[in-house]
Design a protein with these regions (language model features):
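AAA+/P-loop NTPase substrate/partner-engagement loops
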Residues: 99-124
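Conserved catalytic network of the ASCE P-loop NTPase/AAA+ motor domain
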Residues: 71-74, 97-99, 134-140, 165-167, ...
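Pre-Walker A (pre-P-loop) alpha-helix and adjacent loop at the N terminus of AAA/AAA+ ATPase modules
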Residues: 13-76
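Conserved small/polar residues in nucleotide/adenosyl-binding loops
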Residues: 253-260
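Conserved P-loop NTPase nucleotide-binding/switch module
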Residues: 150-189, 198-204, 208-235
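Interdomain "pre-motor" coupling segment immediately N-terminal to P-loop NTPase/helicase cores
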Residues: 1-10
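Conserved alpha-helical scaffold flanking the Walker A/P-loop in AAA+ ATPase domains
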Residues: 124-142
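Walker A/P-loop
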Residues: 70-72, 79-106
Length: 262
């Protein structure tokens, strides 16, 4: 069944409507669809509020602006999808992008390297998004970037060898995730003196990272059983029963870098 764009990001519908649209194309994964629908709704609601605020500022004189309360700025947020290979993470993101009619760029984190080395640098992902938006900067700035295999960006254990595809890539990625202006080539995948450059602001781009995080279940089991007591009077109840932050605690052990854990 071909996915037709039926949702408008300029008047983003309620999360239950987004989820209902996903139900027409994606079978199962109920929890993932619900969480993603809420996250997308919150993201584009913030984007539209930000655009409205900028438009009001352009139509406001300096004197009026000084007397106007700007309100609270809503910080940018991104998404992390955890699931085994073949569970439908990429398909879910593709379907969502088509329903919203926004450009989508998909990349594999294992192909990313530090700028200047063989491979794609992190800024090339923004170039792909611009190309998907037919070089329309404004449309690209409202798009989605999906970075798969994010768990493969863990820092290499060999400290004597330069890490060009691990922590160095993470540092460059953090700038984009937090929101920054990036210069990218127009109509090309790499920077070239003969290719015109343009600036893309990543503040309103939705970044979705996906990964299998192998070994995470073992870390959770180890954490649960570490302080387990033995004997006839042992307390058999898990210490972390009902701990909503358990997954986040365990991700600390598999997260690529300390700053990415946020």
């Amino acid at each position: 069944k071909k996915v037709e764009p039926i949702l408008d990001i300029h008047s983003i519908p309620a999360p239950h409507r987004i989820k209902a649209s996903l139900d027409d194309y994606v079978v199962g994964q109920e929890h993932a669809k619900k969480v993603m629908s809420v996250a997308v709704y919150n993201h584009y609601k913030r984007v539209m509020a930000d655009n409205k605020h900028k438009a009001q500022e352009e139509n406001t004189t300096a004197k009026q602006a000084s007397n106007k309360y700007d309100g609270v700025e809503i910080e940018k947020s991104n998404m992390l999808m955890i699931g085994p290979t073949g569970s439908g993470k990429t398909y879910l993101v593709k379907t969502l992008a088509k329903l919203l009619d926004v450009p989508l760029a998909i990349t594999d984190a294992t192909s990313l390297t530090e700028a200047g080395y063989i491979g794609d640098d992190i800024e090339s992902v923004v170039s792909k998004l611009l190309a998907a938006a037919d070089n329309d900067v404004e449309r690209a700035e409202h798009g989605i970037i999906f970075i798969d295999e994010i768990d493969k960006l863990a820092k290499k254990r060999n400290a004597n060898q330069r890490d060009v595809s691990g922590e160095s890539v993470q540092q460059g990625m953090l700038k984009l995730l937090e929101g920054s202006e990036v210069e990218v080539p127009v109509g090309a995948s790499s920077k070239n003196a003969m290719v015109p450059m343009t600036t893309v602001d990543t503040r309103n781009i939705l970044f979705i990272c996906g990964g299998a995080f192998p070994g995470l279940e073992d870390i959770i089991k180890e954490r649960l059983n570490k302080e387990a007591s033995i004997g006839f009077k042992a307390d058999l109840k898990d210490k972390y029963d009902g701990d909503e932050n358990l997954l986040m605690h365990c991700l600390l052990y598999t997260s690529p870098s300390p700053r990415d854990r946020g």
